[in-house]
Amino acid sequence: MQVYSLENVRNLADKKENWEVICSELKSLGFIITEEPIIESPHHFGVPQVRERVFILGIKEDAFDNRKKLPDGYLTREVLQVDEQLASCSENGNCLSEILEKDVDSKYYLPLEQEELLYIWEEFRENVIGLGSPFWIHKAGIGIYNRDEYLNNSEIGYQDMPEWKKKLVMKSRVMYEENYKFIDDWIARHDMLSRNLIHQKFECICGNDCKTIKDGIIQIRQSGVRVKRPNYFPSLVAMKNTPIVWDERAKHFRYVTPKESAKLQSFNSDYRFCDSDVVTYRQLGNSVNVKLVNMFAESLFNLGKKSTLLGGNVNGKI
């Protein structure tokens, strides 16, 4: 092996001791490496998915072209020319048209119960004043109209919360106090208190970019229903957390398809995955982004002796 590209979750770079062990082992194998973490995401290079990962790159010492300069003695962003390849995504701040297919099988439509849930939260979004933070029904103190009573309610457990959670929960409380007439009626009409706890949490971080949640990118996660602006997709994961979009043709909310997910990981359109959508989603959630890996491979290739890297085939390509 003459070159390599390792990828891992971003917080690996925060664990200094682990990082130093990895770097030491790679250098002991005769590699010139990126001793400082290179943290990048596809959305920095024209692919609309936020997926920050740390990359550790290296090239064998005897494969490195000594005519190239290493001012710091190791590989850096400047040597690899990473910043020269930065590119923005959609110019209008909406990436959906770049990724979404026009005709999608109905099997990707959201189940009616979950689609109904999104319409219920849309009603909430349209009517509540001051929706600038997550709203948690189960921590807002529904039916409690006295602040002191709320603060000392044992079921809510406000006094026992860590400070960060107190601040978050208090925002839900203030939102309820300022909108309790609408919220009480809304909760009763839609029987919100009996719903799954995940469905009782809502976060809309669209700013003024979405007139309705149909304009955004939605996820139903352990932390609740989350709607974000359509500039980038969230990171694909291996768990059941597939992004949801509004399909104007079908007039339904639906999941992003495996083919669309593959676009977010920069796979060629003709790449064939297995027949199981569940397995394909998991594979894509665990995958590295093809464009980033290829970009780093080309950067390493350009630093090497072509005869060494290609085994004498100087006209070869990556």
Where does each model-flagged region fall?
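Class I S-adenosyl-L-methionine
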Residues: 1-217
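C-terminal target-recognition/interaction regions appended to catalytic cores
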Residues: 125-318
